[in-house]
Amino acid sequence: MRFILLIGVIISFTSATLISAESEYTTPAAGKLLVADQTMLDPRFIQTIVLLFRYSKDGAAGLILNHPMNVNVSKIFPEIPGLNSKKEFLHFGGPVAADTVFLLVQGKDPGDKAERVFQNVFISADKSVMQEELGHTKGQEKLHVYVGYAGWGAGQLDMEIAGGHWHVLPADTKAIFYSDPEKIWQEYLDRSDVLQASLIR
């Protein structure tokens, strides 16, 4: 009888551990990455990686990380001296609110006009924060500027994930500050496949 009870406890513990591990890679949340599956049909999101900065029962919002634009940030911040020489280019953050600009910065907390997304990565849509961070000549060099964002209504993203159109991964800074935008999507898609395979062994 004790043996049977022990087996039951082990099975329950193992099941709970598997569920917990699986939810880490399937449950969306702020600070998670969305990696578009090969089946993605929406042309705006084909081969994209999105960093979620907001997620709730009312909807979700994120930034497309791997769509750099051939436009220098100095075009929208001409008042910042020396910005053109930094070769910092704008990124297409998504199809919603194309007139809104966002900053992702890794480093010290910029203050109450910025939100922490994960670890020491912060997001802000405040112009004064952007001007200060972009104007630094030393210190926080890891930053990107985005125009627009990706948005989902209540339950919409969950349906897309359930339909297999997105893979959910924990965020890391490599996905943001990549060296080759043409390779980063495939790298994270492969990583997702490996993680999913490890969960079903």
Each model region followed by its residue ranges:
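Bacterial N-terminal signal peptides
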Residues: I4-A16
